[in-house]
Curated annotation (Swiss-Prot):
The keyword Repeat applies. This is GATA-binding factor 5-B. The gene is gata5-b. It comes from Xenopus laevis (African clawed frog). It holds the Pfam family GATA-N. One of its GO terms (cellular component) is nucleus.
Length: 388
């Protein structure tokens, strides 16, 4: 590893050889790997790479301070050395002391003739497997940005192309979209939401185009006059009263126009309306608002509903009793009316002259009396309260 170790007595197996693909170490720098080709067949096809590689190895060995070997020491190893693989044959480099051969061999690829350089460069560029070490040797490679930006052949071809015959230019498209400078051949309109064409290709506005499409004729330019109201029709007058103003024109049996009043009078009475009934002003019906009528109807129904229960139901809470004759009451203070008198009073009640009422007398109830009378009330089902 150091110069003292490299110059040992065993010269048959040197630690490092300038031919072998091993590492060269220096005391003050990281290890440097000297690559050698592991494909002899490819190196034979590319001899200029072999020369460059050999000269490069010799150059590194000559610059190393610890290696001062001669030509005799370069052949010291034999084929049985474990450091050298037996499957590959290596060509030995020239002596290190021959500086002219070393420099010439190292600089030979750089000073190569133009023909040789182009030959190797073209071969490498065309195959595509091994790129050339120099970017300028390929004759087929175009110069980078030789012309100005955006001046390539593709851009020139795009700019040189003629527009397709079916395409519309931008100016024509804008004119087609906005429709500036157009005029309807029918009505002379200059602006319309949509321009249309007639059968001959002339421009029509949207209204004229739709009218022509639906009716098959040109749209009339003169607007139709508004229809006069029935009360102001020109040239019409009632054949009976000779008035010219009416809310509705009618016709008599002969088909002559009559006013609304004369027509209704003739329809209802069968005779012409007398002229004495003619009025200068048209009498209109005074219609009542519908909301007021509905309000009155609702209030009337509510009042009738409120009055009807009072007439049917009796507000007096006094009960009416019906008793049988010759039966005494078990309740003290209860007045019993005979059946005959009750029936007569019932007839009077129907007539509305008299009313049968239960009038209790003022007395005080005692608990003993209530307990004694509770049993007969439960047993006798024909009592006055049960029969009522």
């Amino acid at each position: 590893m150091y110069p003292s170790l490299a110059l040992t007595a065993n010269h048959a197996q040197p630690a490092y050889s300038h031919d072998t693909p091993n590492f060269l170490h220096s005391t003050g720098s990281p290890p440097v790997y000297v690559p050698t080709s592991r494909m002899p067949a490819m190196l034979q096809s590319l001899p200029y790479l072999q020369t460059c590689d050999t000269a490069h190895q010799g150059h590194h060995l000559a610059n190393h301070p610890g290696w001062a070997q001669t030509a005799n020491e370069s052949h010291a190893f034999n084929a049985s050395s474990p450091h050298t693989p037996s499957g590959f044959s290596y060509s030995h480099s020239p002596p290190v002391g021959n500086s002219s051969a070393r420099d010439g061999g190292y600089q030979s690829p750089l000073i190569m003739g133009g023909s040789a350089r182009d030959q190797y460069g073209n071969t490498l560029v065309r195959t595509g497997s091994y790129p050339s070490p120099y970017s300028y040797v390929g004759a087929d490679m175009p110069p980078s940005w030789a012309t100005g930006h955006f001046e390539g052949s593709m851009l020139h071809s795009l700019q040189g192309r003629q527009p397709l015959p079916g395409r519309i230019s931008s100016l024509e498209f804008l004119e087609e979209f906005h429709g500036e400078g157009r005029e309807c051949v029918n009505c002379g309109a200059m602006s319309t939401p949509l321009w249309r064409r007639d059968g001959t290709g002339h421009y029509l506005c949207n209204a004229c185009g739709l009218y022509h499409k639906m009716n098959g004729i040109n749209r009339p330019l003169i607007k139709p006059q508004k229809r006069l109201s029935s009360s102001r029709r020109a040239g019409l007058c009632c054949t009976n009263c000779h008035t010219s103003t009416t809310t509705l024109w009618r016709r008599n049996s002969e088909g002559e126009p009559v006013c609304n009043a004369c027509g209704l009078y003739m329809k209802l009475h069968g005779v012409p309306r007398p002229l004495a009934m003619k009025k200068e002003s048209i009498q209109t019906r005074k219609r009542k608002p519908k909301n007021i009528g509905k309000g009155k109807t609702s209030t009337g129904s509510s009042t009738s509903a409120n009055n009807s229960p009072s007439s049917v139901t009796n507000t007096d809470p006094t009960p009416v009793l019906k008793t049988e004759p010759n039966i005494t009451s078990h309740y003290p203070g209860q007045a019993i009316v005979p059946v005959s008198q009750g029936q007569s009073q019932t007839d009077d009640l129907v007539n509305g002259s008299h009313e049968l009422k239960y009038i209790p007398e003022e007395y005080t109830y005692s608990p003993s009396a209530l307990s004694q009378q509770s049993v007969p009330l439960r047993q006798e089902s024909w009592c006055a309260l049960a029969l009522a």
